[in-house]
UniProtKB/Swiss-Prot annotation:
NCBIfam families the record matches: PRK00026.1 (NF000648), trmD (TIGR00088)
Catalytic activity: guanosine(37) in tRNA + S-adenosyl-L-methionine = N(1)-methylguanosine(37) in tRNA + S-adenosyl-L-homocysteine + H(+)
Similarity remark: Belongs to the RNA methyltransferase TrmD family.
Coiled coil: none
Protein's organism: Halorhodospira halophila (strain DSM 244 / SL1) (Ectothiorhodospira halophila (strain DSM 244 / SL1))
GO MF annotations in UniProt: tRNA (guanine(37)-N1)-methyltransferase activity
Subcellular location: Cytoplasm
EC number: 2.1.1.228
The protein's name: tRNA (guanine-N(1)-)-methyltransferase
Keywords: Cytoplasm, Methyltransferase, S-adenosyl-L-methionine, Transferase, tRNA processing
Positions annotated to bind S-adenosyl-L-methionine: 120, 140-145
Example GO biological process: tRNA N1-guanine methylation
Subunit structure: Homodimer.
Record function comment: Specifically methylates guanosine-37 in various tRNAs.
Amino acid sequence: MTGTPNSRRIDVITVFPEMVEQVARFGVVGRAAERGLIELSAWNPRDYAEDRHATVDDRPYGGGPGMVMKVAPLHRAIQAARAADPRPARVIHLSPQGARLDQDRVARLAACERVIYLCGRYEGIDERLLEAEVDEELSIGDYVLSGGELAAMVAIDAATRLVPGALGHEDSAAEDSFATGLLDHPHYTRPEVYERRGVPEVLRSGDHGAVDTWRLKQALGRTWLRRPDLLAGRELDERQRRLLDEFIAEHRAEARAGNDHDET
């Protein structure tokens, strides 16, 4: 796909290019590509292999199970990706050994004009390729995937959301979970009542100030309940502190009321 001179270019080195290319066909990433905000291309190292079998892996030195991805095909694929655009590219290896991908790192990715994602397979990639070509390693969590493609797709989607013009509503990214360092507040839509569960009255009041206060209170409270680590060391202003204290008091009162009901 062809982008504009100001578009972000994303290249992915993968033995499964069709898998990664799907991310540019749907949702936010698809719309951003259609608008020329991003350009995504996949590069298969098999196309740069040295033999007629397009071999990209070999047995590990020192023995052991599995296969290791070879230096030469990956190196040539990365060089081809670099040559496709004159702008400097940051090469990122998706690996469980990398730094954890969080919203701050996502924002830095979104600010990069060019990123090349390197997706490993098998037992891993020859260390010499990583030493020569990789600028950064990123992980999406402490678990093992079959390859880096899914992690690359996660990073691409998260970063594209922050590219100006990618979302239908410019405030959407600013209000996402983690964008403010807090989890998101609850959301509701029609109908007003579903199986006896209603929408909070404040959201139907038309009072935008009250709605904003309720949403901030819920975001603070939900973060306290589900991800207290995000609040550790965070400096809350007076309003935030008051709203969080109110939420905690209300939550504990509801819990006590529930316990009293269970005992009767």
